[in-house]
From Swiss-Prot:
Gene Ontology, cellular component aspect: cytoplasm
Needed cofactors: Mg(2+)
GO molecular function: ATP binding; magnesium ion binding; phenylalanine-tRNA ligase activity; tRNA binding
Pfam family name, one: tRNA-synt_2d
Localization (cell): Cytoplasm
Binding site for Mg(2+): 252
Self-association and partners: Tetramer of two alpha and two beta subunits.
Organism of origin: Cellvibrio japonicus (strain Ueda107) (Pseudomonas fluorescens subsp. cellulosa)
Protein name (record): Phenylalanine--tRNA ligase alpha subunit
E.C. number(s) listed in UniProt: 6.1.1.20
Cofactor binding, note field: Binds 2 magnesium ions per tetramer.
Biological process according to GO: phenylalanyl-tRNA aminoacylation
């Protein structure tokens, strides 16, 4: 039993000195494992007399319990120390300033489209869309553009085949709307359009928004008032607006819309080519032939239509002088919006 006391004290000292869980496990195996020093004493009980065995067995079990309890206590301390060390290594210094997230932004053309839609939605217009590959009838014939019209030429239009084109305007959406809905109609038709043209102010693909109003007793005065109020709302300024007589095969009478130059306030500059005015779109009263082709009675209803280039409006609103910047995906340009 003297050997038992020495082994117990030795085991307890090693437990107390164990610096990590691996060292602690090694102590347990050495003293309480199947071949451990204290476990081996139990195997020697057979050499004692029957009278001595119970007392000796009780002493050995008491020693085992003492060592096991010390092991458990030390294990808890070491585990907690490991957790504390891990937490200390992963601590977040809340006094540091936060790092801002680099979020994306909307493209200026998208911003412009959304702004146009919001302005017209506020006065009761709905948004209509249509196919970008359009048939000859809806892109030309139904809009009073006969086969001999210059717009049909290959140098102006992208032809997919003999009877289909990449739409040259969103006016076909107006025709489809009149075919499928009965007046009164108040819609705008935004979307991509395609033309054989490319320079600083033109792109083979660009965005256009057209509008259509059909009802009884619609007049040119309604058109002028609508466009005047829209342009003032869009540019957030009391910009002077003028209408110049023009020609479009699908409207009669027709007009071009100009606003006073936003750069020189009408005095004349390089942007407006010294005229003091900037063109923003075309408009007019819907031609009776377009009504007939769309199934609307021109004797009962009248209407007006207008069309504007979205990139053109974006250029004027944001002061951009080259249309191609909108399509180059240059972050130095896009981050400004």
């Amino acid at each position: 039993m003297e050997n038992l006391v020495a082994l117990t004290q030795e085991a307890l000292k090693l437990v107390a000195d164990a610096g990590d869980l691996n060292a602690l496990e090694a102590v347990r195996v050495d003293y309480l494992g199947k071949k451990g020093h204290i476990t081996a004493l139990m195997k020697n009980l057979g050499g004692l007399s029957p009278e001595e065995r119970p007392a000796a067995g009780a002493e050995i079990n008491k020693a085992k319990d003492a060592v096991q309890e010390a092991l458990n206590t030390r294990k808890q301390l070491l585990e907690q120390a490991a957790i504390n060390a891990k937490l200390a290594s992963e601590v977040v210094d809340v006094s540091l300033p936060g790092r801002g997230l680099h979020t994306g932004g909307l493209h200026p053309v998208t911003r412009t489209l959304q702004r146009i839609e919001e302005i017209f939605a506020a006065v009761g217009y709905s948004v209509e869309e249509g196919p970008e590959i359009e048939d000859d009838y809806h892109n030309f014939e139904a809009l009073n553009i006969p086969s001999h019209h210059p717009a049909r030429a290959m140098h102006d239009t992208f032809y997919v085949d003999d009877t289909h084109v990449l739409r040259t305007h969103t006016s076909p959406v107006q025709v489809r709307t009149m075919e499928n809905k009965k007046p009164p109609i108040r819609v705008i038709c935004p979307g991509r359009v395609y033309r054989c043209d490319s320079d600083m102010t033109h792109s083979p693909m660009f965005h256009q928004v057209e509008g259509l109003v059909v009802d009884k007793n619609i007049s040119f005065a309604d058109l002028k008032g609508t466009m005047d109020q829209f342009l003032k709302a869009f540019f957030e300024a009391d910009v002077p607006v003028r209408f110049r007589p023009s020609y479009f095969p699908f409207t009669e009478p027709s007009a071009e819309m100009d606003i006073q130059c936003t750069q020189c306030r009408g005095k004349g500059c390089r942007v407006c080519k010294s005229t003091g005015w900037l063109e923003v779109g075309g408009c007019g009263m819907v031609h009776p032939e377009v009504f007939n082709a769309s199934g609307v009675d021109p004797e009962t209803y009248t209407g007006f239509a207008f069309g504007m280039g979205v990139e053109r409006l974006a250029m004027l609103r944001y002061g951009v002088n080259d249309l191609r910047l909108f399509f180059e995906n240059d972050l130095r340009f896009l981050k400004q919006f």
